[in-house]
Amino acid sequence: VESNHLGGICLNWGCIPTKALLKNADVFDIINNANKFGIEVGEVTINWSKIIKRSRDVAKRLSKGIEFLMKKNKIDYIPAQGRLIGKGNVETTDSNGKKALASANNIIIATGARPKWFSGIKPDGKQVITYKEAMILDKQPKSLVIIGAGAIGVEFAHFFQTFGTEVTLIEALPNILPIEDNDISVELEKIFKKRKMNILTNTKVTKIEKLKTKIKVHFQGDEIVEAEKVLIALGV
């Protein structure tokens, strides 16, 4: 039973499509540094819509592959929402509101994850976004504040900054990638700073102020950072 696309968050909106975006960034970086290898190239331009489309196509293709494997292995796939209604029983509701009953001796709940945000600071999908909107932006932002420097935050920081977005990365704990080994965190911070990324650690956001064409991010000490968009990447 699955109400969205087969493969869940990781395949459709997480690990897989973000790695496709990072591959685009790596190729762009290699081309821009080709002269170091004795290869001369002309002016390099990007097609943002194609960059985004490639990532989405990768996710769609793999999700379709899972659907094929379900059929091949004779696994019943019910595209619907499921709700436990008693021992061994799941009520399903499809997109048209049609209900049905599925029964089994054993039931596994594997419902995935959802974005986390501050109390009182909720994403609007336009100026204040989550990882999902960040993967399908129709236009590259000129500037971006990323709140949270875990795996999700640093991946998007690398991706957007490589393509020229001015990135500010904010983390409440002493290091970026706070749950990784300290030597990894320190080394990555050096790399990001060498690339002129603005990194603020030990920094807690107190307020997000939305204006017409920009956002002001307030943090302790009455400090403010302005950007076109804010990406909330808390938790992971």
What kind of feature is each model-predicted range?
Residues 1-3, 147-148:
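The Walker A (P-loop) glycine that initiates the GxxxxGKT/S ATP-binding motif of P-loop NTPases
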Residues 2-140, 168, 173-177, 183-186, ...:
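Glycine-rich flavin
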Residues 81-83, 150, 203-204:
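Conserved acidic residues
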Residues 107, 228-232:
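AMP-binding/adenylate-forming core of the ANL superfamily
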Residues 111-112, 203, 234-235:
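Conserved NAD(P)H cofactor-binding loop of Rossmann-fold oxidoreductase domains
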Residues 138-180:
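Rossmann-like NAD(P)H-binding beta-loop-alpha module
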Residues 198-200:
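Conserved SAM-binding strand-loop segment of SAM-dependent methyltransferases
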